[in-house]
Amino acid sequence: MQFFGRLVNTLSSVTNLFSNPFRVKEISVADYTSHERVREEGQLILFQNASNRTWDCILVSPRNPHSGFRLFQLESEADALVNFQQFSSQLPPFYESSVQVLHVEVLQHLSDLIRSHPSWTVTHLAVELGIRECFHHSRIISCANSTENEEGCTPLHLACRKGDSEILVELVQYCHAQMDVTDNKGETAFHYAVQGDNSQVLQLLGKNASAGLNQVNKQGLTPLHLACQMGKQEMVRVLLLCNARCNVMGPSGFPIHTAMKFSQKGCAEMIISMDSSQIHSKDPRYGASPLHWAKNAEMARMLLKRGCDVDSTSAAGNTALHVAVMRNRFDCVMVLLTYGANAGTPGEHGNTPLHLAISKDNMEMIKALIVFGAEVDTPNDFGETPAFMASKISKLITRKALLSLLRTVGADHRFPLIQGVPTDQSSAATPHPIFSLDKTQPPAISLNNLELQDLMPISRARKPAFILSSMRDEKRIHDHLLCLDGGGVKGLVIIQLLIAIEKASGVATKDLFDWVAGTSTGGILALAILHSKSMAYMRGVYFRMKDEVFRGSRPYESGPLEEFLKREFGEHTKMTDVKKPKVMLTGTLSDRQPAELHLFRNYDAPEVIREPRFNQNINLKPPTQPADQLVWRAARSSGAAPTYFRPNGRFLDGGLLANNPTLDAMTEIHEYNQDMIRKGQGNKVKKLSIVVSLGTGRSPQVPVTCVDVFRPSNPWELAKTVFGAKELGKMVVDCCTDPDGRAVDRARAWSEMVGIQYFRLNPQLGSDIMLDEVNDAVLVNALWETEVYIYEHREEFQKLVQMLLSP
């Protein structure tokens, strides 16, 4: 039995030896009385264990000389001596200063630290061990600022990286640790604290003024730069409260630029909230604003909402739009454009964003830039237009696609005649064709068919500029009516058409028309015209608004839409606050059966002498008078599309009864004039001479397979009935809200019968676009199709502009 016992003990010893020779084990000192003492230092003794042929290091407990701990058991005497020397050098300050060290778990941790970090001082080890009493030992205090280790870091660096605020206090208060000492990477304790997770450590460091707060490491980063790079928003806040400087140059500029480069929105917002001037700061290297560094739509939108200059240029002359196009960031491009970025600004070498988009072969981006006003024939410093650059693209398929795209809006890819370009470079060029009535005298400006500048020479020829600028003071002898269809976000099509008319005429829409009628989205635009909001501004507003309003699933929350309307028109603005032009919005009174059409007016409703359709019902409240009607509520009521938004009180969307408000508007004008005559004010009545009706785009006609609804007799017929009911329901809704077809035919016929010039402008769209579409690419494509429509119908636009400008 003794043999087997010794065998088990031997196997156990061997197993422990091979498993972990440095496993700390509590022992009795008496067990080693028969072993030879090889070396002794203080409480540490190295024994030679002859029976096991090992060298054991024993730490005798200072509190009890009969007990101790075996720190290691090694087979090699040389290894044992080396480790004994290291242990005897590092251990004494710990067991001399704290009884907590005299536990197996603590000693094991300390042993592992000593072996893992042989270059560390006792103070470094004390930081990782985390026992506060140890920092009162004189030897640990003496090494508080030591950098003698592989990283060159001080114990304070380690405490900050570890995030141990209690140890940090011990180092600063008792050991007088310096906070501006740098490691091998040039980093101070502040850099280490930023990389940790405990902001309290950073707060403690920041209580005392130190150059380390703004120290730049070898990568050129201050602690604030590093916090922004890592997305540590709370660390950024603490650093700023500790007066960290925001104007220290780093590899990517100032800290705000670093936050933008790494798309750390929270950090950028924190810097701007603490120092609003940082939103306009330009980095010394590139002269770029924070907006130039925006890599996604969210970051760009955040800056622009806080007032960042959208057209700020870098040292090279490029705007943020140039950079976004060069980087193929379509989402950024759309945000910049919708916040008013100039799509035609020349940048480095005179290249506009469109020049750069052509070179990137990005069709969506090209369309977006042209839709937002980029000129296809503006030359750069080398005399190259975007269209000419498209003709030079090496890839045949790409070249053909680009040229085909640009030709649809009248772009000329030939090299233009430009002043300042050498004659040998432009001798083969021919003058660009001008789509105007007088082709013998092309204007001295570059052509932009998309913005209808080909029409501007005509309007200038007919009216000098000083007359155009004073048109609002002229007395027209006839009235002009503008009618705007409903269609949700497709109101962008109306905006694009109005921009074209304004560009061609040189006159704001408000001054071209005496009456404006609108339904739903058309009603919102009618109010925008009334309140002198530019259509370019409204285009951006619509792109921004859709993301705020159309969130989640239908029906959408009404709050965001109402907040948008209040923001744009004012919370307390009344309909009658602005009197010209006269505006009417359609709404549907749904508190009665059958429902009735209601017009929200900025003038008193005309008195109509005719028998009422229904007997008066005392349970039905009369509508609010125009003088008391809030503008935003009128817009909300006109746009309360069923299934998209909840009703606004008793009002539903006006599109249910008048999605194309032309005939209703003409009827209203007739009744208004008749009322004026009855009241003896016939001299104020002016005959309606022009009606302009703008649509939100015609959806393509598609075949319908079945609208049959019947009692099914089998599962197949049930499926057929369900499908038929769905198609029939869609057809009923489309028929009720159809703004084209017979509605247009009736309006045109009535106008012709009474001698009114009628213009219906409504582009054919390539696909059916929903009222709540939020995809930028889809909407840009719809506006592109609108631009193509404008170019193809330029003669009709010419005629319209001529008539609108006539007195």
From Swiss-Prot:
The keyword Membrane applies. Keywords: ANK repeat, Cell membrane, Cell projection, Cytoplasm, Hydrolase, Lipid metabolism, Membrane, Mitochondrion, Phospholipid metabolism, Repeat, Transmembrane, Transmembrane helix. The active site is at 520 (nucleophile), 653 (proton acceptor). GO terms for molecular function: 1-alkyl-2-acetylglycerophosphocholine esterase activity; calcium-independent phospholipase A2 activity; identical protein binding; long-chain fatty acyl-CoA hydrolase activity; lysophospholipase activity; serine hydrolase activity. It comes from the Eukaryota. ANK repeats lie at residues 120-147, 151-181, 185-215, 219-248, 251-281, 286-312, 316-345, 349-378, 382-403. Homodimer formed by catalytic domains tightly interacting through a large hydrophobic interface. The contact area involves 3 alpha helices, several loops and a part of the beta sheet from each monomer. Both active sites of the dimer are in close proximity adopting an open conformation that provide sufficient space for phospholipid access while favoring cooperativity in deacylation-reacylation reactions. Each monomer has 9 ankyrin repeats stacked side-by-side in an elongated structure oriented outwards from the catalytic core. PANTHER family: 85_88 KDA CALCIUM-INDEPENDENT PHOSPHOLIPASE A2 (PTHR24139:SF34), CALCIUM-INDEPENDENT PHOSPHOLIPASE A2 (PTHR24139). This is 85/88 kDa calcium-independent phospholipase A2. It comes from Cricetulus griseus (Chinese hamster). The lineage of its organism: Eukaryota, Metazoa, Chordata, Craniata, Vertebrata.
